[in-house]
């Protein structure tokens, strides 16, 4: 494809996507007019003091599914500390589905499962907090959660929010299964208001799967919003989710982030290079970096990927701008996004079957044409000796990437 054809094609695609979803957004606005919109809007950006940068931590679902208990959660908290991951910013320990009994108690409260959480969630929260970490919990904007093994919070939003606050919960992943048929744009703000009244700042993660494009309405409602369906530990799943999430790049900002789902790094379904691509794209996309492997038993290879301080720094950059695709030529892609300090994050991605060279042009990544640029390779941990003018070209292996920070020096 010629560069002109490519440049024209991308805006047209964005226009088509935008026009497709605008009717849905207007509908959601009209639905919400019956609520106190000013109360919801107070949550916009930083009003709960959370999500200034994308959250980092761990979630139980990808590796353990429903096979969780308080011993494993405590051991995971221990591992975050002993591995040094907590010092890098991985501070959330998030319990996913299946933690509660199927029935509420006589007061209408959720009951931690006696067989797996005999000490209760508050005791687990106290332990996690004693390690300098934060505890996350899971619920659902329906009558039951997705596993159907425990109740959802539909109709109990205020009661459950107060319970979570009393337990010391710091993060709520709020799923979208088994509802009453009403739209997420109706059900999710109810929990938002309940959390605001709970007396405790709780990060609100909207797990709506992207069905009604929550990137377009999520910022007054939550601190992050899923833009896609669930990830699987395969190259095809990961890369297709990255594509879908990128469409909504302009909606990410401090206080509210696009969420392409938890990380699969370390679960064994991809190669090392593919996991590096996975972690790199999530980092430049300002996605939540929630580990989904068993961090108690991480390999050295996995640790080297998820503990890359330079890549994490891109994700946590205070500028808070999600990177976008700026050039696509067949299986070759150039992603770029601005960073603080007049720097640029640059990803060269080879989705194809063979090793090849990829070129990034300054005009595509909004660097002045005659600028002399220094390039830092974040996976090789070295600043390239060569200075670059006008473009940068690198040879990239199949299903692999190069990740740089570019800094104009003249």
Swiss-Prot record:
Family of the protein in this entry: Belongs to the glycosyl hydrolase 27 family.
Glycosylation sites: 297, 391
Recorded catalytic activity of this chain's protein: Hydrolysis of terminal, non-reducing alpha-D-galactose residues in alpha-D-galactosides, including galactose oligosaccharides, galactomannans and galactolipids
Residues annotated to bind substrate: 96-97, 173, 208-212, 226, 230
Encoding gene per record: AGAL1
Cysteine pairs bridged by disulfides in the record: 66-98, 146-177
The protein, known as: Alpha-galactosidase 1
SUPFAM superfamilies registered for this protein in UniProt: (Trans)glycosidases (SSF51445), Glycosyl hydrolase domain (SSF51011)
Keywords: Apoplast, Cell wall, Cell wall biogenesis/degradation, Disulfide bond, Glycoprotein, Glycosidase, Hydrolase, Secreted, Signal
InterPro entries, per the entry: Aldolase_TIM, Glyco_hydro_27, Glyco_hydro_27/36_CS, Glyco_hydro_b, Glycoside_hydrolase_SF, Melibiase_C
GO cellular component terms, semicolon-separated: apoplast; plant-type cell wall; secretory vesicle
Signal sequence annotation: 1-27
Subcellular localization(s) per the UniProt record: Secreted, Cell wall; Secreted, Extracellular space, Apoplast
Pfam family, one: Melibiase_C
Source species of the chain: Arabidopsis thaliana
GO molecular function: alpha-galactosidase activity
Function: May regulate leaf (and possibly other organ) development by functioning in cell wall loosening and cell wall expansion.
BP-aspect Gene Ontology terms: carbohydrate metabolic process; cell wall organization
Keyword hit for Glycoprotein: yes
Self-association state and partner proteins as the record states: Homodimer.
Residue numbers annotated as active site: 175, 230
Annotated EC: 3.2.1.22
């Amino acid at each position: 494809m010629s560069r002109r054809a490519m440049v024209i094609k991308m805006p047209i695609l964005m226009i088509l996507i935008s026009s497709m979803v605008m009717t849905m957004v207007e509908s959601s606005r009209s639905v919400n007019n019956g609520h106190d919109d000013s109360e919801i809007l107070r949550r916009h950006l930083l009003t709960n003091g959370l999500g200034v940068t994308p959250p980092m931590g761990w979630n139980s679902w990808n590796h353990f599914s429903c096979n969780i208990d308080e011993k494993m959660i405590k051991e995971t908290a221990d591992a975050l500390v002993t591995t040094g991951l907590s010092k890098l910013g991985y501070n959330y320990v998030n319990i996913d589905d299946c933690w509660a009994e199927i029935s509420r108690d006589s007061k209408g409260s959720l009951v931690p499962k006696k067989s797996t959480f005999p000490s209760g969630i508050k005791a687990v929260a106290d332990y996690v907090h004693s390690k300098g970490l934060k505890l996350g919990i899971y619920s659902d904007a329906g009558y039951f959660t997705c596993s159907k093994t425990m109740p959802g919070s539909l109709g109990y939003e205020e009661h459950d929010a107060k319970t979570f606050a009393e337990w010391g919960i710091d993060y709520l992943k709020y799923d979208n299964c088994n509802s009453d048929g009403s739209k997420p744009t109706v059900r999710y703000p109810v929990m938002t208001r309940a959390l605001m009244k709970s007396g405790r700042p709780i990060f609100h993660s909207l797990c709506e799967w992207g069905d009604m494009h929550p990137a377009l309405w999520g910022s007054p409602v939550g601190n992050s919003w899923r833009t896609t369906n669930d990830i699987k530990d395969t190259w095809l799943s990961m890369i297709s989710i990255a594509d879908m999430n990128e469409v909504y790049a302009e909606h990410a900002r401090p206080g509210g982030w696009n969420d392409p789902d938890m990380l699969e790094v370390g679960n064994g379904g991809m190669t090392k290079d593919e996991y590096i691509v996975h972690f790199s794209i999530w980092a430049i996309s300002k996605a939540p970096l929630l580990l989904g492997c068993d961090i108690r038993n991480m390999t050295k290879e996995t640790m080297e990927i998820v503990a890359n301080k330079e890549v994490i720094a891109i994700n946590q950059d205070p500028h808070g701008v999600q990177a976008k695709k700026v050039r696509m030529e067949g299986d070759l892609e150039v992603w770029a996004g601005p960073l603080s300090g007049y720097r640029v994050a640059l990803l060269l991605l080879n989705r194809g079957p063979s090793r090849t060279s990829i070129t990034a042009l300054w005009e595509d990544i909004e660097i002045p044409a005659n600028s002399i640029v220094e390039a830092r390779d974040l996976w090789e941990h070295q600043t390239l000796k060569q200075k670059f003018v006008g473009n940068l070209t690198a040879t990239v292996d199949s299903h692999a990437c190069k990740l740089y920070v570019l800094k104009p020096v003249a």
